[in-house]
């Protein structure tokens, strides 16, 4: 199985006249499965429609989850946008939206969750608190627990798991440049400590895709490949590409 993995395209920042040129960089392959690990774009936008139509027609199957930015500046709650996305993706025969849900494809169980972080110091805030309607750190942590409960319940009765989350599932996956004293509180918004879960279920998890951080990475934890390929903001010039694949 050949998996194309991408995250953090941030289509909401692409000009409408640039969108077709932007997505052509994907160079799709009909033999591949596409993994979209969140922060793809504003789901209420034309750019999002153009992109999803292209993806649906270009890969034999796509699995997508929401990141935090899917919920930004829509005057909608997280629950309202989740409901919208469930209905939105019904029009696409080859795309599955996973929101604390799983789906079997061939012999693998694709498991998807935004995996919100657990916030221990609410005094240090990021844009999520301002850009998402009716959202605060209490709801943030409540969503975090729902995601963890889902993953723990799913793994009990399923094997051959391909896990897709937006938030980073281990502090070990945070780039060293962010592990400095003035970034420690900031990092709590980027990762969810799933180390015990990973260790306990290392024989069931085949690979794990994530996003949120704009640092590309392939790293093994407990012999599980953890993969991240963010495109990032255009002004970051991080030079990641659309064509990274993982063969399982």
Language-model segments: residues:
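Active-site neighborhood of phospho(di)ester-bond hydrolases with catalytic His/Asp-centered motifs
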Residues: 5-7, 34-39, 63-68, 96-100, ...
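A basic- and aromatic-enriched beta-loop-alpha substructure that forms the phosphate/nucleotide-
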Residues: 61-132
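Active-site-proximal loop/helix segment associated with metal-binding centers of metalloenzymes
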Residues: 111-185
């Amino acid at each position: 199985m050949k998996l194309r993995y991408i995250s953090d395209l941030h289509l909401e920042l692409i000009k409408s006249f640039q969108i077709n040129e932007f997505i052509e960089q994907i160079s799709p392959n009909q033999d591949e499965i596409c993994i979209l690990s969140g922060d793809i774009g504003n789901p209420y936008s034309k750019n999002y429609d153009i992109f999803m139509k292209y993806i649906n027609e270009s890969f034999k199957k796509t699995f997508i989850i929401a990141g935090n930015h899917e919920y930004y500046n829509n005057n909608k709650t997280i629950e309202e946008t989740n409901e919208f996305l469930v209905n939105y993706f019904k029009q696409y025969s080859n795309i599955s939206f996973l929101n604390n849900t799983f789906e079997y494809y061939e012999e693998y169980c694709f498991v998807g969750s935004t995996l919100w972080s657990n916030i221990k110091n609410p005094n240090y805030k990021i844009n999520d608190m301002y850009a998402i309607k009716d959202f605060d750190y209490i709801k943030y942590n409540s969503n975090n627990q729902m995601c963890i409960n889902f993953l723990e319940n799913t793994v009990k009765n399923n094997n051959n798991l391909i896990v897709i989350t937006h938030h980073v599932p281990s502090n070990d996956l945070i780039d060293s440049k962010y592990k400095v004293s003035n970034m420690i509180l900031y990092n709590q918004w980027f990762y969810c400590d799933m180390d015990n879960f990973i260790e306990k279920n290392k024989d069931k998890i085949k690979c794990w895709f994530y996003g949120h951080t704009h640092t590309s990475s392939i790293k093994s934890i407990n012999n599980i490949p953890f993969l991240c390929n963010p495109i990032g903001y255009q002004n970051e010039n991080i030079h990641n590409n659309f064509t990274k694949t993982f063969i399982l």
